[in-house]
Amino acid sequence: MLEIRNVTCIRDERVLFERLNFTISDGELIQIEGQNGAGKTTLLRIIAGLGYADEGDIFWKNESIKQNREEFHSDLLFLGHHTGVKRELTAFENLAFYQSMHDNYNEAAIWDALARVGLAGREDVAAGQLSAGQQRRVALARLWLSNHKLWILDEPLTAIDKQGVKVLEKLFMDHAKQGGIVLLTTHQDLFIDSNELKKIRLGE
């Protein structure tokens, strides 16, 4: 369970959000909505422990992430605007490196993940030679390799075609059905039943 308790964020003397409270239970898929500048990315970074709140705290499994940072990060997969893809490595090598960091190397799973994001035939191309959209697909392929319970995804559908969006939507729903938590922002319309997708709107 993820809890956001009384979180206030002020940037450049402007209040982005104030005394924000909500709880996300295991098995939930949540979309953060709001106008540009409402603080969606800032909120995701605060929840992920990558940014600071002026007031309030984030709790994971009933403990503050400040006191439980190691376990929290072991449960977290965060994908932000910066993909974290290493330009000098191939698409395959990037995912192999990601798996090696988590002591979970599986070559067949890497090939499968790259195929699922539409990069079959591009596995051995250096990431620096891929388009920005293809680099983002490399980053998204980590989702198929992840055993993290909490996914925090900032605009994961950027530069993804309609078929790719459908594939990712199914992945998000499957992760939630297996007891995981997906927290995301997107400017695209999601074709997910309202019973399976909850929305939290900032700026209102």
Curated annotation (Swiss-Prot):
Domain ABC transporter: 2-202
Lineage: Bacteria, Pseudomonadati, Pseudomonadota, Gammaproteobacteria, Vibrionales
Gene Ontology cellular component terms for the protein in this record: plasma membrane
Function: Part of the ABC transporter complex CcmAB involved in the biogenesis of c-type cytochromes; once thought to export heme, this seems not to be the case, but its exact role is uncertain. Responsible for energy coupling to the transport system.
Family affiliation: Belongs to the ABC transporter superfamily. CcmA exporter (TC 3.A.1.107) family.
CDD domains, per the entry: ABC_CcmA_heme_exporter
Name this protein carries in UniProt: Cytochrome c biogenesis ATP-binding export protein CcmA
Keyword set, alphabetical order: ATP-binding, Cell inner membrane, Cell membrane, Cytochrome c-type biogenesis, Membrane, Nucleotide-binding, Translocase, Transport
Catalysed reactions, as listed in the record: heme b(in) + ATP + H2O = heme b(out) + ADP + phosphate + H(+)
GO biological process, one term: cytochrome complex assembly
EC number: 7.6.2.5
Pfam families per UniProt: ABC_tran
MF-aspect GO terms: ABC-type heme transporter activity; ATP binding; ATP hydrolysis activity
Gene name linked to the record: ccmA
